[in-house]
């Protein structure tokens, strides 16, 4: 009923190869006729040409790891696309009107405020996205963020602060008419 091509890796493929992969999945796996095929990607390695190739092959949902729209927050994370580029790409994807378009947002990022999270959620709604996933920052071994925490260069948000981030995002989503499907 669902196939998830995740981790951002699929968008590293050429459009032709991405289409071949999705076509092979549709042809060789026992999928239901209404099977959702999600393609997770990174904006800097994804373009409308790849999106069209994936959609032509049968992808039905595109999920992008935006994390935050704020350039001040994105830059230290190594995100290559600017706020304007992210917004433009998402608007173009939505305009294709051929798949559900969703994004991942992260709260608890360095320099982020609860209002930043709320603004990101409002921006998603304003773009006409089909949904969003709101995740707490997860400090992963070997990443620059965890290294900064270990060296005392960054303090991670504590439970109360994380709660404030989540509450701001949830309130903004509710104000936009979105309802949570899981917490």
Language model region names:
Residues 1-183:
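C-terminal scaffold of the Radical SAM
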């Amino acid at each position: 009923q669902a196939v998830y091509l995740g981790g951002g890796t699929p968008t590293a493929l050429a459009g032709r190869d991405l289409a071949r992969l999705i076509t092979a999945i549709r042809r060789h796996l026992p999928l239901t006729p209404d099977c959702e095929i999600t393609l997770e990607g990174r904006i800097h390695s994804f373009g409308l040409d790849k999106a069209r190739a994936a959609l032509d092959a049968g992808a039905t949902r595109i999920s992008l790891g935006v994390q935050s729209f704020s350039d001040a927050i994105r830059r230290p994370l190594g995100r290559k696309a600017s706020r304007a580029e992210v917004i433009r790409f998402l608007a173009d994807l939505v305009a294709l009107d051929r798949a559900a378009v969703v994004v991942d947002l992260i709260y608890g990022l360095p320099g982020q405020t609860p209002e930043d999270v709320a603004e990101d959620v409002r921006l998603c709604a304003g773009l006409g996205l089909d949904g969003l996933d709101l995740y707490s920052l997860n400090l992963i071994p070997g990443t620059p963020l965890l290294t900064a925490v270990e060296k005392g260069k960054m303090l991670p948000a504590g439970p109360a602060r994380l709660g404030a981030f989540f509450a701001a995002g949830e309130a903004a989503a509710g104000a936009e008419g979105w309802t949570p499907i899981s917490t």
